[in-house]
Each structure stands twice: as structure tokens, then as C-alpha cells.
């Protein structure tokens, strides 16, 4: 089943919480987020990790372990280590990313290795002073509302299970993810076309991933904002206007055929056309859906959020596919798909 959702700032709005132990921690459409050193503290990260550990112990096979990853935000590696220690201390084996990694790389690792779930320290596209926690279910996607309700309840109950320390193994999650992308897309065909691209990682955890893929296949490109900078100077790491202005200028100046930008944890993408104009997500999804159905011959129905373009309906109808409309939110998508 193919799922399509339009990214918006509104649907991923920050979820605040106090750092007081009694304050409730609420999960939004794709995780819990708060301001660093206010609601987002080591204490609260451990509270959430304890709740996730309790969920895994009660509802999943804990021997399958949990994948833990993180983005380039301030303190993310340390917060990830704290979460990993809580999970391992509960008797759950942990594979901790050895470096910054895109959220989709954690999702892929969960699904590919058969893990019980995944924890990502990230605040996605929010301003620099925010951070958060996402939980990926055993199928690799965002946890369903039912799962998140259990985790919220476990958080409120102060769950902090203890067991024999199961150990933390540091692993590089990116190579397998890069190989999967290379196997899925016809990159040799793109290379033969002679296109030149601009890549903007927006100082986020997508840094170097697309560049590595292009380098492996001899695709010409220029890259901007690849360095780690937790302050995300002059932008929110969200691939929409006005934050893609530097990418637009680069595409024109370097005479690129197109430009691509990924957000803070590289699970959203924006595009710029050859003339420097911004290509919105609705057009990206439409092109992608047509490619998936026509070239890749993906089976199943199409699920889209109600805020996405009706072009998707026309493309689905052309290929004889039924369209199901759902509410906004990655975890709603997980349930609908």
C-alpha cells in the first residue's frame, strides 16, 4: 500500500511539557517535542525511554532489541545515549547509531533487522532550541495512536523497568540504508542522463547521504549546508520557502537541473526546479506516485492525507487504484496503511 502525506509546519507543531516529574508528557502527530533545558531534559528523556521500555517488555518481543538514533541537534548524541542506557538497563538489547543518521535510516533498520522498535532523538524541522523523541514501531513506521496511548500512560505512571543490562552495541546505520536506496532507484539511468543537481542538507542528519549515493554512481552535484551546526543559522530546517532560498540561488548560479533539500532529520524533502522556482510537496508526491505505480508496479491501494492534492486521486484512478483519505499525522498514516 502506498501512502502519501503533505508535510506542514502546523501538523508537526511542537508538543510542550514541563521538566517537572509530575507534568504529563504528551505525544503529538509524530512524537514528543519540547524546548531544550525546559521541557526537554535528561530526566524527561529517561521518563519517555522508561515508558517505551515498559511497552516493549509487555507488548513486543524484547529479545529483538531496539534501534536508537539521533539527529544533529544540540545534545542529541548524549540524549540518545541516555535513552539507550534506560532501555538496556531494562534488559532490552540496544543498537545505538554511531553517528548522526536520518530518521528513515532508523526506520529502515528496524524493519530490516526485525527489531522490536526504534527511538529517534530529533525535533525534525522545528527551531534550533527544540528537541524531541520519535518512536518507530516494529514495522518501521510511526507508532499507531494505540501504541502511543500506551506509552503516554506508562510515562504518566513513571514506568522505569529494571533487568539484567542487555548491552549497547554501536552500529553505523547509514550503509545499509544507502544500499537500499541504490537498489530501489535506477541511479545509473540518472547518471546517463547527464543531469546536475544541488543538494541542501540544512545542517541536518541527511548530511552526506545523497552526496554519497551520487558519488557512487557518478552523478554530478554541488552540496550546501552539509556541516553540523545545531544553531541552524538563518533557517528552520524545513524544506519550504523561505528556508530554501540558498538552494534556489545555488541551482541558478551552478546551472543545475534541479535541487533537493532535506529537513533536520531527513524525513522530508523539498525540491527546486531548473529555473529556481520552488516545487511544492504536492507536485513531488504526484510525480513520485506515478513513478511507483507505473515504473515500479507497486500493488495495493493509495492512502493520502486530506490536505494533499487531488492530483493523486487522478493518478491513482489512471492506474486503477482505490484512494483512501485519512487525517493528518504519520501515526494516523501507520494505522490507515
Stretch-by-stretch model annotation:
Residues 2-5, 11-13, 17-85, 89-90, ...:
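An N-terminal, well-structured beta->alpha segment
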Residues 3-4, 22, 26, 192-215, ...:
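A structured phosphate/pyrophosphate-recognition subdomain
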Residues 21-22, 131-254:
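Gly/Ser/Thr-enriched, mixed-charge loops and adjacent short helices
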Residues 37, 135-138, 270-274, 317:
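Short beta-strand-to-turn element immediately C-terminal to the catalytic PLP-Schiff-base lysine
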Residues 54, 58, 62-130, 182, ...:
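N-terminal small/polar loop signature for handling phosphorylated ligands or for N-terminal nucleophile
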Residues 76-81, 148, 207-211, 313:
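Short, surface-exposed alpha-helical segments at coil->helix boundaries
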Residues 98, 150-179, 273-337:
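Proline/glycine-rich low-complexity loops and linkers
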Amino acid at each position: 500500500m502506498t501512502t502519501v502525506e503533505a508535510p506542514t509546519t502546523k501538523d508537526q507543531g511542537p508538543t510542550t511539557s514541563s521538566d517537572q516529574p509530575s507534568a504529563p508528557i504528551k505525544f503529538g502527530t509524530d512524537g514528543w517535542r519540547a524546548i531544550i533545558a525546559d521541557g526537554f531534559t535528561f530526566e524527561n528523556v529517561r521518563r519517555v525511554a522508561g515508558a517505551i521500555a515498559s511497552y516493549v517488555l509487555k507488548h513486543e518481543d524484547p529479545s529483538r532489541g531496539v534501534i536508537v538514533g539521533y539527529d544533529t541537534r544540540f545534545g542529541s548524541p548524549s540524549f540518545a545515549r541516555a535513552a539507550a542506557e534506560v532501555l538496556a538497563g531494562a534488559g532490552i538489547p540496544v543498537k545505538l547509531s554511531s553517528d548522526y543518521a536520518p530518521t528513515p535510516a532508523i526506520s529502515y533498520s528496524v524493519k530490516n533487522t526485525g527489531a522490536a522498535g526504534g527511538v529517534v532523538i530529533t525535533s525534525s524541522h522545528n527551531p534550533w532550541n527544540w528537541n524531541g523523541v520519535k518512536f518507530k514501531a516494529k514495522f518501521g513506521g510511526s507508532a499507531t495512536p494505540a501504541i502511543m496511548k500506551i506509552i503516554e500512560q506508562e510515562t504518566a505512571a513513571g514506568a522505569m523497568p529494571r533487568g539484567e543490562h542487555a548491552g549497547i552495541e554501536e552500529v553505523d546505520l547509514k550503509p545499509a540504508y544507502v544500499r537500499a536506496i541504490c537498489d530501489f532507484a535506477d541511479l545509473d539511468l540518472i547518471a546517463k542522463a547527464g543531469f546536475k543537481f544541488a543538494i541542501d542538507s540544512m545542517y541536518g542528519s541527511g548530511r552526506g547521504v545523497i552526496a554519497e549515493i551520487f558519488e557512487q554512481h557518478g552523478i554530478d552535484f554541488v552540496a550546501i549546508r552539509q556541516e553540523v551546526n545545531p544553531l541552524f543559522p538563518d533557517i528552520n530546517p524545513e524544506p519550504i520557502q523561505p528556508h530554501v532560498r540558498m538552494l534556489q540561488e545555488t541551482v541558478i548560479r551552478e546551472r543545475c537541473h534541479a535541487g533537493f533539500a532535506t529537513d533536520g532529520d531527513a524525513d522530508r524533502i523539498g525540491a527546486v526546479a531548473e529555473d529556481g522556482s520552488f516545487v511544492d510537496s504536492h507536485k513531488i508526491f504526484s510525480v513520485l506516485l506515478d513513478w511507483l505505480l507505473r515504473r515500479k508496479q507497486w500493488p495495493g491501494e493509495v492512502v493520502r492525507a486530506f490536505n494533499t492534492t487531488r492530483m493523486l486521486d487522478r493518478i491513482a484512478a489512471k492506474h486503477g487504484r482505490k484512494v483512501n483519505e485519512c487525517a493528518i499525522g504519520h501515526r494516523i498514516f501507520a494505522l490507515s496503511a
